[in-house]
Amino acid sequence: MSAPKKIVVLPGDHVGQEITAEAIKVLKAISDVRSNVKFDFENHLIGGAAIDATGVPLPDEALEASKKADAVLLGAVGGPKWGTGSVRPEQGLLKIRKELQLYANLRPCNFASDSLLDLSPIKPQFAKGTDFVVVRELVGGIYFGKRKEDDGDGVAWDSEQYTVPEVQRITRMAAFMALQHEPPLPIWSLDKANVLASSRLWRKTVEETIKNEFPTLKVQHQLIDSAAMILVKNPTHLNGIIITSNMFGDIISDEASVIPGSLGLLPSASLASLPDKNTAFGLYEPCHGSAPDLPKNKVNPIATILSAAMMLKLSLNLPEEGKAIEDAVKKVLDAGIRTGDLGGSNSTTEVGDAVAEEVKKILA
């Protein structure tokens, strides 16, 4: 029997505890029917919960445990309790991304089931068939650049910097993702090259990397503001792989996340290397936040469960089991078992139970 897969779980704040519990439930369901698949879960603090307990948003023991794990499963961080002071929950998330060199954030945007089309804010005839992955550069750019706070002089600034190797690295990730399909998916590179020097370097490097290393692929460049309009008007036009910088990726992926009808549906992966052997180290989390105002047992766990499916496929070399989770989610949604954000009346735990049972049936 192979050694158990070590997964560090960082529930975080508010609904983070609930959604990670449901993902773990589904993973344990796999072990129930596949004796050769075992998981070793190790919980640690991050975010506001870590600040309350230790004074810092990412304790050293949580970071060190994550470095030794096969993968990390994260819930959500933040909330109004911790405000915008000098020590904030989000700092823990930025630190773990940087320390683990999680340079590529993958955010799929598609419909887990066509039965959800009517829930999209976009008319079904335009939303149907939407299927793209945002590949966001995660450890560079303006979020990690030099900055100056307002120290009383009424001036504050942030700086955006990218290097050729950073852009090459994220371009290779986008190309790898495109080449997993036959025919290869188109690549869209989003920037602001008509204004920003960093975007001009970005565009030039993306173009040269694709041309020199992946000559069979095609990349099209789109200004970020234009892409934001296209995403609302005709989202399928951007089907394929979308590559963009840290801040632009943060914004465009949040815009995209409402297309399927709920933030509670979309997973994400943050990877430290190409998943060419399905064993890339990664951190997996839902695209939504900590939802501090949501009552207990009401949050949609699907995004976190699907994040666990991505983890199985990209980091733990368990693609069949990952696909089983995705198929189980579709069956559960088609059966009308849904939380309130999808027009249903089921609780968080009921949805998790249903997915876990479907996974067992599929893999039995």
Curated annotation (Swiss-Prot):
Cross-referenced InterPro entries, in alphabetical order?
Answer: IsoCit/isopropylmalate_DH_CS (IPR019818), IsoPropMal-DH-like_dom (IPR024084), Isopropylmalate_DH (IPR004429)
GO biological process terms on file: glyoxylate cycle; L-leucine biosynthetic process
Q: How is the cofactor bound?
A: Binds 1 Mg(2+) or Mn(2+) ion per subunit.
- UniProt GO molecular function: 3-isopropylmalate dehydrogenase activity; magnesium ion binding; NAD binding
Residues binding NAD(+) = 79-90, 289-300
Query: What family name appears in the similarity comment?
Result: Belongs to the isocitrate and isopropylmalate dehydrogenases family.
List cellular component terms (GO).
cytosol
Summarize subunit and interaction data from the UniProt record for this chain.
Homodimer.
Name the Pfam families on file. Answer: Iso_dh
Query: Predominant location of this chain?
Result: cytoplasm
Q: Does the keyword Transport apply?
A: no
Which residues does the annotation say bind Mg(2+)? D225, D250, D254
- The EC number on file is 1.1.1.85
Query: What is this protein called in UniProt?
Result: 3-isopropylmalate dehydrogenase
What sort of enzyme, by top EC class, is this? oxidoreductase
Pathway linked to the protein? Amino-acid biosynthesis; L-leucine biosynthesis; L-leucine from 3-methyl-2-oxobutanoate: step 3/4
Q: Which UniProt keywords apply?
A: Amino-acid biosynthesis, Branched-chain amino acid biosynthesis, Cytoplasm, Leucine biosynthesis, Magnesium, Manganese, Metal-binding, NAD, Oxidoreductase
Task: Enumerate the PROSITE patterns for this protein.
Answer: IDH_IMDH (PS00470)
Per the UniProt entry, what species is this protein from, by scientific name? Saccharomyces cerevisiae (strain ATCC 204508 / S288c) (Baker's yeast)
